[in-house]
Amino acid sequence: MNRREFSTSFLLGLSAVAISANAVAQASRGSAGAASKLPTVKARNIVLVHGLFADGSSWSEVIPRLQAKGLNVTSVQNPLTTLPEAVDACRRVLDRQDGPTVLVGHSFSGMIVTEAGVHPNVSALVYVAARAPDAGEDYTALAKKYPTPPASKGVVFDGDEGRLTEEAFVRDFAGDLPRERALALYAVQEPFKKALLTGKTTNAAWRQKPSFYAVSTEDRTIDPDLERFMAKRMNAQTIELRSSHVSLISHPVEITDLILRAAG
C-alpha cells in the first residue's frame, strides 16, 4: 500500500469511528441522557421515598410493576417534619435491606436521597423530578435562579403545617392526572412542617453513586430547567417525560423502567 492509499484508508477509518461514536452518543441522549461514569451494580432491593404534598402511597403505580420483576420494594413513610428526622426514617429502612439497594426519591425527597444515599447498602440513586443539592448547598437560593413555579403560590399554612390548596394541587402539582384521581390524592396529602424546608444536606451521594434522573418537562412545582441543571451536574443518566410533577403516577411505566435500569 503506497502513502496515498494508506492516508485515504486511515481517514476513512477515522470517519467510520467518528460516525459510529456519534450514533452511539445520539442514541444515548435520546434514551438516557449523559451516561454516568460509575458502574451499575445489580440490585434486588428498591427503597422509594415520597416528597411534599403526598404519602407513601404515591408510589402505588410503580410498586407492583417492580414487584412483578421479583424485586423487594419498600416505600418509606416520610414524616415531613425536619430533614434529619426524614433522613433517619429513610436510613432505618436502608438498614433493613439485605444487599445492594436502589434509593429513589420524588420531589423534595431528593434531599433525603442526596443525604442518605451514602449508606453502604445503596448501589444507585434515582431522582424523579426531585431536588438534588450539593453538600451544604442552599437549595432555596439555587431555585431562585430559575422562574418561580406556579405551585409555590398555592402553599398555605395552618400554624406550622403547610399544604397545597385544592386548586394548586389539581392544576400545578398533578396537572396531567384525571381530576378525580388528583382530588383523591389531594385528600390524602400529608402536611409538612416549616422546619423541613430549612434543612441542608451534608452529603452529596450523587458524587459517589451512579445516578439517574427523570425530568418532568411540564412541571409546575419544580422548574424543568432547574431539574435539567441538577441532572446534568450529577452526570445522571437522564430521561425527559412530558409530564406534570407526578410522573411516578402519570408515567409509571417509564419511571419503573428507569429504576430497573438503575438496578442493573
What are these regions (language model features)?
Residues 122, 126-159, 193:
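Flexible "cap/lid" loop of the alpha/beta hydrolase fold
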Residues 67, 72-102, 116-119, 139-144:
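Active-site loop/oxyanion-hole signature of alpha/beta-hydrolase fold enzymes
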Residues 193-234, 239-243, 248:
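Conserved serine/cysteine hydrolase catalytic core
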Residues 5-26:
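N-terminal export signals
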Residues 1, 20-42:
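C-terminal segment of N-terminal export signals and the immediately downstream linker at the start
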Residues 43-83:
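Conserved HGGG/HGGXW glycine-rich cap/lid loop of the alpha/beta-hydrolase fold
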Residues 105, 109, 113:
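Gly/Ala-rich beta-loop-alpha elbow adjacent to hydrolase catalytic centers
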Residues 249-261:
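Post-His helix in hydrolase/transferase enzymes
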